[in-house]
Each structure stands twice: as structure tokens, then as C-alpha cells.
Amino acid sequence: MLIKQGDRLINTRNWSELVKPDQISRASESADTMYGKFVCEPLERGYGTTIGNAMRRVLLASLQGAAFVAVKISGVQHEFTTIPGVLEDVTDIVLNLKQVRLAMDTEEPQHLELHVNKSGEVKAGDIKCNQHVMVLNADQHLMTLTEDVELTFELEVRMGKGYVPADMHEGLSDEIGLIALDASFSPVRKVAYTVEQARVGQMTNYDKLILEVWTDGSISPEDAIAYSAKIIKDQISVFINFDERISEQENEGRSSASDVNENLFKGIDELELSVRATNCLKSANISLVGELVQKSEGEMLKTKNFGRKSLDEIRRVLGEMSLDFGMKVDGFEKKYQEWLKRKQQNEA
């Protein structure tokens, strides 16, 4: 469609005719809130790699997280020394502190304290936190005291993003004994993505993006990908040099029941399906094709007595009508009623 904006013609078909994913589905449900596997399909050919690579970079480098930025140890003037009664040297203790994962609910720097006076292993859980900071990996080893030694650690926590070297922290005190730390703020520990073929109707030359995200527990994988997508959207929107709202208004209301694939209005009984598949759909209260295509494959497989064989059978029948699972049909009930009314008028 060509839309006039000022003295320019905007061709909305440049984006309106591209295949777009209807939703992101979580492929792996787990009690582990630090891992998520997500599937995004269908995408235009090549878009899986484009989007996957962009999401991976932003996930790893651009999300806010908390980390220690400095430590002061009683009686220690620099990190290249040892502490009597402590098995590890200060350098090793500093390395262990960098492995502590934190969650913080304020943007203001926070100061924590660790006080020890008895022999034995000291863990991250021994750090005294306040109401704004929480240690996520309490079992992280910090050091081992070989005898009863009294030590006090003063720790500064900040919010930030990405990786910041020790000499790049702003506003740290230059007092003797304060050891600046390299800080890895990113709450995302690892990201992996793969691209597979996706099917739309009879066509299989589309992309399926599978994105795996591991976090430190301070943020859920779902929120991590949502924030990353928002960052990318905000960064690239500056390239759009026309008013998107006008094209949306021009297209508003143009869609009606006559524009929709009328196979959506067919009853399940009209499809050439096995008795088993038909009964499974009816038991799930699915009576129309339009209701069926809005279900994801994962949702269907959770239906009682519904297996992979029935799924493949239904997918084949839907494909013959240029339909598939996971489709988004806005206002289906209204469109169905319009179609039904028009059909009754034609038959009268």
C-alpha cells in the first residue's frame, strides 16, 4: 500500500508483507530460574542469524547488574601481599570476591562488611548485607583461615553494565589500602543461539531462532531478553524517517472478515482428520479452525491423549489450507460473527 506523507510516498509493503513471529515460546520449562530456552518463529530467511547475533551481544554487554568495585582489608595496604593466618594471598581473595554475584534494588552505591575471627572456611554468605543488597551465590568460597585471626573487609557495591576494569571506576577514594576491583556487572552469564528451518504453510525456507540464556539469578531469562529487545528497538528506531502513526491509522479498520482466510471459519468436523485427532480437539473445546491455529504446538501436546502423530496429521491438513499452529488472528470471534452473518444473508 502506498501512503502519502507530505510530498513523499511510503510503501508499507516493504514491511507489511514480511513474515513476522507471532510470539516467543519458552521451549524448556524448569524450576531453574537462571536458564531459559526460547523459540521465535517464523522469521524471514536470514533474520534468525541477524536477530540472534544482535540479541546475544546486547544480552552480554548492555544489561544492568551489581558487583563489588572496591575492597579494604584491615591491616592490608595493597593486593600483592599475604595475610598471616589466611591460606590464600590477597590476590586470590580478590579473585574470589569477583565471583560473588549480587542483586541490588537501588542505584546508589552500597557499603557492606565482612568480619571474621575464627579459623575455617569463609564464604560469600558470611558477608553482612543490608536491605538493598543480596548475595546470590552464598556458597562461593572466599578464603580459608588456618587460625583464629580477626579481619574486617569493607566492600563497595555499585550498579553498572558490561565489564569495567579496576582503573576505570569513577569516584573511588584514593586512600591507602583501598583495592579497586575489575567488575563484571552483566547479570547474563552465557548466551547461545541456533537457527533452524521453519515452516509456513507449504514453505519451509523460513528461519526458527532458538535462543538460550543463562543468568546469575538477579534477573529472569524472560526479562533479560525483553530488556535486550527494548534496547535494540530504541537504538534503531532513530533510522525511521517517516511518521509510523499515520501508516497505522491509514490501515486501521481495513481488515474485515472478507480479508481473512475463510478456512479459519471451518468447523473441526469439516476437516479430514482421524477420529482420534477430532475427539482430542473436541475434548480441548476447540470447534473451529480459527481457534485451533491460535494454539502453539506445545499447548496442543499438553492436551490429554494428544500425541506427536495427531500433531503431524493436523499440521499437514492446516498446511493444505496455508495455515499453521501459532498464528495470531486478531478479533477472531468478531470476524467469525461477521462472516456468519454475511453467509446467512447470502443464503436468504
From Swiss-Prot:
Residues 260-348 are annotated as: Alpha C-terminal domain (alpha-CTD). GO terms for molecular function: DNA binding; DNA-directed RNA polymerase activity; protein dimerization activity. The keyword Phosphoprotein does not apply. It is an enzyme of class 2 (transferase). It catalyses: RNA(n) + a ribonucleoside 5'-triphosphate = RNA(n+1) + diphosphate. One of its GO terms (biological process) is DNA-templated transcription. The keyword Nucleotide-binding does not apply. Keywords: DNA-directed RNA polymerase, Nucleotidyltransferase, Transcription, Transferase. Belongs to the RNA polymerase alpha chain family. DNA-dependent RNA polymerase catalyzes the transcription of DNA into RNA using the four ribonucleoside triphosphates as substrates. This is DNA-directed RNA polymerase subunit alpha. The gene is rpoA.
